[in-house]
Amino acid sequence: MNQEVMNLFNQQAQPQSFDQIKISISSPEKILSWSYGEIKKPETINYRTFKPERDGLFCARIFGPIKDYECLCGKYKRMKYKGVICEKCGVEVTLARVRRDRMGHIELAAPVAHIWFLKSLPSRIGLLLDMALKDLERILYFESYVVIEPGLTPLKERQLLSEEEYLRAQEEYGEDSFTAMIGAEAIRRILQDLNLEKIAADLRQEIATTTSDLKPKKLLKRLKIIEAFQLSGNKPEWMILTVVPVIPPDLRPLVPLDGGRFATSDLNDLYRRVINRNNRLKRLIELRAPDIIIRNEKRMLQEAVDALFDNGRRGRVITGANKRPLKSLADMLKGKQGRFRQNLLGKRVDYSGRSVIVVGPELKLHQCGLPKKMALELFKPFIYARLDAKGFSATVKQAKKLVEKEKPEVWDILDEVIREHPVMLNRAPTLHRLGIQAFEPKLIEGKAIQLHPLVCAAFNADFDGDQMAVHVPLSLEAQLEARVLMMSTNNILHPANGAPIIVPSQDIVLGLYYLSIVADGAPGEYKSNNPLNPMQGVYGDFGELEHALASRAVTLHSKVKWRWKGLGPDGEEVTRTYDTTPGRVILSSVLPRHPKVPFDVVNKLMTKKEISAMIDTVYRHCGQKESVIFCDRIMGLGFSHAFKAGISFGKDDMVVPENKWTIVDETRALVKDYEQQYQDGLITQGEKYNKVVDAWAKCSDRLASEMMNRISSVQKDEKGADKQVNSIYMMSHSGARGSPAQMKQLAAMRGLMAKPSGEIIESPIISNFKEGLDVLEYFNSTHGARKGLADTALKTANSGYLTRRLVDVAQDAVIREVDCGTDAGIRMRAIIDAGQVVATLATRILGRATAEDLVAQDGSIIVPKGQMIEERHLDAINKAGIQEVKIRSVLVCATKNGVCATCYGRDLARGTPVNQGEAVGVIAAQSIGEPGTQLTMRTFHIGGAAQIADSSFIESSFEGTVRIRNRGLARNSDGDLIAIGRNVAVVIVGPDGTERAVHRLQYGARVRVDEGDSIKRGQRIAEWDPYTRPILTEVDGIVAYEDLIDGQSITETTDESTGIAKRVVIDWRGSARTADLRPALAIHDQNGKVLKLPRGSDARALLPVEAIIGVDPGARVKAGDILARVSTESAKTRDITGGLPRVAELFEARRPKDAAIIAEKSGTISFGRDYKNKRRLSLTPHDGSEPVEYLIPKGKHIHLQDGDVVEVGDFIVDGNPAPHDILAIKGVEELAAYLVNEIQEVYRLQGVSINDKHIEVIVRQMLQKVEITDSGDSEILTGDQIDRTELQEINEQLVSEGKKPVQGVPVLLGITKASLQTRSFISAASFQETTRVLTEAAVNGKVDTLEGLKENVIVGSLIPAGTGAMIADIKSIARRRDELIMAQKTAESGAALQELPAAE
């Protein structure tokens, strides 16, 4: 009896736990098995009684009762009749909740095609039948007949016939001699008649024998879909519906509004149309209506069902009464408002509140101020429980009353409840994991949340009206994780780069900077030759120093001697004397005592960088707890001294340099000179523009440095003591606020402005803000500023979308094991750009594991293989002069379905080796996406000062001796050494004989050093003209023109504004008559014979279009002289895609617009006959394989000559290389290095630091797929793309069976494509193109094993990262154990069965 009572209450279905989800096409039988009855009427509810109509869309007989345990007519009420079916109204007495899961169905009078399988590209039905979508639609929408059985007639199977053709054929061959049908019945019949095995065998045969390039791809696609149907158990004819399922009524509710109107879900309208048309069709068929009418009705039924499944996919969008498109079933799933993203991936959270934030400078780092009112509301259940436990209330109702009246005991209990119960604070937008942190609440009056100033950087919060949300972790486990993982004190380092993020800013920095300033001649300073008071300014005790400060005997900035007592290297007490200031001594008083944290850490001017370094030092040596206490103290110190300093900002602090107008006038003269040169035709319009912009940029920089010199120099008063430092300089130099660029605009000149198009306006703004702008200048300045505002809005959206794609592609990269045991690694070296070390080797390898022993020169091992490189190793590595280290990387990690901790290295946010279960993919995505809003959106046009100035020379960054590799140098007529070879490199060798740097020289560069020269740091190695590309001669001789025919291939142009003539090569390929010309300059000897080059080819320089010829025929030239030049301007101002678009382009692995052409093999170049308007260039490889041909568009400047030798990977035509080419030609490691460097470059320009490993994680995810090149002994087809792990599994099995393994090459996918091709269809469907993903998954009968994070969030189980990773591991161990036991039991029972007959 008891059991039955329990069963009554256990009505709710327990949540099922499952390990995988399968999706497939449902058969008509399956739909009927779900259904509780057929819906025959389009009515919904009776407008008078408000009861659902019988057999209608809300029928209670089919879907269940409207009220719990009550039938519709009211005959049976209450629980005792549970399960009874009322004989009057036919309703089962049960819970009303069943109306959420009982389905119905509609029997269609004619079959209709499922629009997803028809129209979702590629059309599945079309692929399967090998018919065009156009033809299929003509059949389905009753425009054409299709022949199904041609019989003995000359018609072909599946031939389309129009109405007239059909009738004619019937007359001609007789009605029964062939079968032709129309509509979905026809397609269904064809699908039913398919023999999949036979088609598959034929296709395999055809693929094996076909010779063309494109055909196998098409056949492969078709074969794949046929195999999908064979393997998944789906039948092709199920893609044509004969029954339409109807979803439960409570999922498409009809809600009465006041005023007798109803709000309804769009689905009800769509279902109503289907039922109406279906019923009308049934009636017409019964009445034996004419064919044409029935056909029209069938077409309308097909359209109604199409609209129900996916409105707007075909034909017009069906709109409701208010002209708004109706939301179909497909629309319910897709997009930001769809089921996946709106309700499954992001849900609203209870126990949360939000309010404005204000600063809480007296809080400790782990605290936040929570308004009492808010706390009372959030912690209500806890308060009720505690009131009950303490006996203040007997029932919840009483407790409610007490809380509502806010009785004194309630506040006491609130205090108890809140103690040690962390809350989570979140600021939107949450761009990285530091956007949600846990704090211990401290109750405060008022209505605003108080936030600790040091965590503002992590939240990117300020106090100008920002709001934050509070969430309460309820369960004990949640509280535990909030405290251990999310507490603000546990998030001191930035996950993107491992630098401290709890860094003082603004006032605090200013206060600490002021505290550490040194002033000459301040009262009470120590003088070494002070006969009157030799001990003045000598202090050994902190109390004494404070006393002196209080009595004004000494200032914070006076120079004093200080006896410091601290710990020596071995922890012993030591005393040292330092020259310092009282301010710095005060600062040192908050430092933790530790041998590695000496007084030197604070004995310097504390800028923001220095403070960050100091916090870093304290964290690395003293641990987390000390650092947190230290940060809080330092914050207090900074605030109090910023307040005491009283630094203000006045107009007189902005000092305009006296020589401003002199510099401006000089520049004006220079610009005038350039104008004149342009008038005289010496330079082109583009070159003039570049030079003018350059001149003004230099002027602006000079003024800025003059101003900085003035502002930063300290003035003396009449006694010779230092006056106070300029306030603006203090703010900027300390890093508290403002940058040199802003100061330049305030006091020097505003400088060059950009147009909205991104070009720079030639005339700069000469005034500064102190002097004020005139009208024209103001207009120019608003011009660019408005563009900036518009950009910011776009940028935020773009950056958010990039982050979303990154998270999606990387979400399942989780640390699965400690070490995958691979021996592979990638080589790391310092990054050097234009002779400057941009990223040192030490910073790049810190916190990574070595892939081989790291050996010093004496043979001792610095770091053994597989060990982490720590800070303590860096000195030894630098001393050993190691230039390259092979380290482990996630790119080569061999772990299946994740990465291993050794390949990943250090967890940057903790400074320790990464834990198992850490979701490194998501961290990588957030680290790259979060600074996205700081990147620029514009594409730079070459021509700005910045782009050109830094690329016209190379300076040495090391001392050493010069060696020249591939020596191709010549002295020209001016006696300069010119690089005439393509691969000339200057190598700088250090004193110990190691190569310090290798610089490849630009073709045509003037070289300032020669073999064996010794070179100093900063010395020029070479320089070149950045505005033009020269075409040089490599031998001495006499110039001769070839194929340079006036008016056909060469023209004398006269610049209209200058009247000076120059000879320019024009496009000669326009007409057929001149298409075969090959304009060139040849070098002859005395007798008029073409000279030979050392490598054997003729001394002839082919000229590109728009080359400007600089020599006359018959002129004598020396090797290294310039024959012609191509203005880089006229080679079209190439846009450099910068900032966010560039990062997106790289991650999406798109082919750049003007992609470089890369040599696939090492070999010799020769020019073939031109083809149409392209140059033909062929590369004969050294290894004797077939020559490779390249067709190059005519306008491109090819800087190679006949007979030049190129190495693998050399550029044949300049430009950005396509990542796919790098992968194919140079392999994975080179590709990764290229992507990492290019992406880092964009971030570096903005001063954002991201660790390489984050980019590597994303690149690993982009390289998940492999293209099969040789299918070995497997069923896989050549040309197919499969997962890397899948390939490993297949090969392991093949090898174990002694068969030939499958060979494949890695394929690079962009992040969007990679996300859509993950093994989990749930994850892909919730990302983009939901319809297409689900259609494909259903056809393939895909199984989602729920391995990634996203799928698990969607199905509502614990994610397999962090704590969930451990639970997932335990589950899989248990599953394996169960399988073993089951196998064992089966074997035992089998053995027992064997013994049975013997027992008889």
From Swiss-Prot:
Record's cofactor remark: Binds 1 Mg(2+) ion per subunit. Binds 2 Zn(2+) ions per subunit.
GO cellular component, one term: DNA-directed RNA polymerase complex
GO BP annotations, alphabetical order: DNA-templated transcription
Cross-referenced InterPro entries: DNA-dir_RpoC_beta_prime, DNA-dir_RpoC_beta_prime_bact, RNA_pol_asu, RNA_pol_N, RNA_pol_Rpb1_1, RNA_pol_Rpb1_3, RNA_pol_Rpb1_3_sf, RNA_pol_Rpb1_4
Protein residues bound to Mg(2+): D462, D464, D466
EC number: 2.7.7.6
UniProt keyword list: DNA-directed RNA polymerase, Magnesium, Metal-binding, Nucleotidyltransferase, Transcription, Transferase, Zinc
GO molecular function: DNA binding; DNA-directed RNA polymerase activity; magnesium ion binding; zinc ion binding
Binding site for Zn(2+) 2: C820, C893, C900, C903
Pfam families in UniProt: RNA_pol_Rpb1_1, RNA_pol_Rpb1_2, RNA_pol_Rpb1_3, RNA_pol_Rpb1_4, RNA_pol_Rpb1_5
The reaction(s) this protein catalyses: RNA(n) + a ribonucleoside 5'-triphosphate = RNA(n+1) + diphosphate
HAMAP family for this protein: RNApol_bact_RpoC
Subunit-structure text: The RNAP catalytic core consists of 2 alpha, 1 beta, 1 beta' and 1 omega subunit. When a sigma factor is associated with the core the holoenzyme is formed, which can initiate transcription.
Family to which the UniProt record says this protein belongs: Belongs to the RNA polymerase beta' chain family.
Task of the protein: DNA-dependent RNA polymerase catalyzes the transcription of DNA into RNA using the four ribonucleoside triphosphates as substrates.
PANTHER family cross-referenced by the UniProt entry: DNA-DIRECTED RNA POLYMERASE, DNA-DIRECTED RNA POLYMERASE SUBUNIT BETA
Name recorded for this polypeptide: DNA-directed RNA polymerase subunit beta'
Protein source organism: Methylobacterium sp. (strain 4-46)
